[in-house]
Design a protein with these regions (language model features):
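Short alpha-helix boundary/capping motifs
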Residues: 129, 252-253, 284, 312
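Short, basic interhelical loop/turn and adjoining N-cap
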Residues: 227-236, 286-298
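Extended, domain-scale alpha-helical bundle/helix-rich regions
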Residues: 277, 283-287
């Protein structure tokens, strides 16, 4: 602001290594693999850069690349404006960057602008995130068969989806089934090992599915890392999803048996863990060769229901008056007051367009 106050709204980490345009990479907020020391180095560098460039008021986004083997950090770019990353950061945190930037431009300072969600804290309070946001790019190579599907520094995605969960695994799987490409998770990819290794080595739109398939085929995280240079933390999370799939598939007899109301099986823990990993009822049904309605019936029978938590910029430290909600399978949960039920009709989710994120009804602040 005009008083030289600076706040960091959000840290966003790319799933893919350097060499792929940020708009074509899966991104995660907050950053998951940085140590506190690395984060503070980036924070200090960001503040120094924005001051050196001469941004009097408003927002900027600064991108870094970090070599975690030797600690070398370089600046990729600095955008002294509201950008696509600003839009993602606003949605991820509930902090209205464009609105605040406009007020700063007319002379207000950060400590003079109230937070509309808490009505207590000023804009100089940095947002706190107690959830994980995943942005997944949407490609349309099926409409352009002559286009090269290899991902490079030139952006090729036509849109993106954003999802929120308590963990990276949950938010990733939510994003996968929001793409409207017929995917409900990390489904099997029919491919031999040579094709799998080729798809791992060459960045492409389906690489996350091929990583999961490589894990199913017995490749180690180290082998996949050496082909993709994707941080092992992300690969370990994908392995946990694949391991959960195997556990579900290995429980077919128990699941089927538990559908008999006279002989219920002790499956609450397995189904609850699967839902916390972000598995949809349809994906669980695919793994068990069952109907989606059977899984939903089993869930409800065992009182495994989605609950709702709030995006309030402060991790529930203060009361929230205008937060928005996301679903998860965890307690405690946010209770919506009132006895009336509402039915929302409209065009949401919006269809994907050029660099347009999908907004689903559940995450829309107006649909509460």
């Amino acid at each position: 602001d005009g008083k030289d106050n600076v706040v960091i709204i959000c840290s966003i980490e790319n799933f893919d290594p350097i060499g792929i345009h940020t708009g074509d990479s899966i991104t995660v907020a907050p950053a998951q693999t940085l140590s506190d020391k690395e984060y503070q180095r980036m924070r200090d560098a960001s503040i120094a850069i924005i001051r050196e460039i001469g941004v009097d008021t408003g927002g900027s986004n600064i991108q870094f690349a970090l070599n975690q083997h030797d600690g070398r950090m370089v600046v990729i770019e600095m955008n002294p404006r509201v950008s696509r990353s600003s839009s993602l950061a606003s949605k991820a945190t509930g902090f209205p960057i464009a609105k605040i930037a406009a007020k700063l431009a007319v002379g207000l300072s950060l400590d003079e602008i109230p937070n509309d969600i808490t009505r207590e804290t000023p804009a100089s309070f940095e947002p706190t995130i107690d959830y994980v946001v995943t942005k997944f790019p949407r490609f349309a190579f099926e409409k352009f068969p002559a286009a090269d599907p290899t991902l490079t520094t030139q952006m090729k995605s036509v849109g993106e989806v954003m999802s929120i969960g308590r963990t990276f695994k949950e938010s990733l799987q939510k994003a996968l089934r929001s793409l409207e490409i017929g995917s409900y998770g990390l489904e099997n990819v029919p491919a031999d090992m040579s094709l799998i290794k080729s798809r791992l080595k060459t960045p492409n739109a389906e690489r996350v599915w091929f990583i999961a398939q490589a894990l199913r085929e017995g490749m180690s995280i180290r082998e996949i890392y050496e082909l993709t240079w994707i941080d092992p933390w992300f690969l370990q999370n994908l392995k946990q999803i694949v391991d959960m799939e195997k556990e579900i598939e290995g429980s077919k007899e128990n699941i089927i048996f538990s559908l008999d109301p006279l002989n219920p099986g002790p499956l609450e823990s397995l189904i609850l863990r699967a839902k916390r990993y972000g598995f949809s009822d349809r994906r669980i049904a695919q793994l068990l060769d069952m109907q989606e309605t059977d899984i939903r019936h089993l869930r409800r029978k065992n009182n495994i229901q989605a609950v709702y938590k709030i995006v309030d910029t402060c991790a529930a430290e203060f009361a929230a008056y205008t937060p928005y909600l996301y679903s998860t399978y965890e307690v405690p949960y946010y209770r919506v007051q009132g006895s009336k039920d509402l039915r929302i009709q409209g065009s949401n989710p919006r269809p994907l367009g050029p660099s347009t994120p999908v907004v689903d009804n559940e995450a829309n602040p107006g649909n509460r």
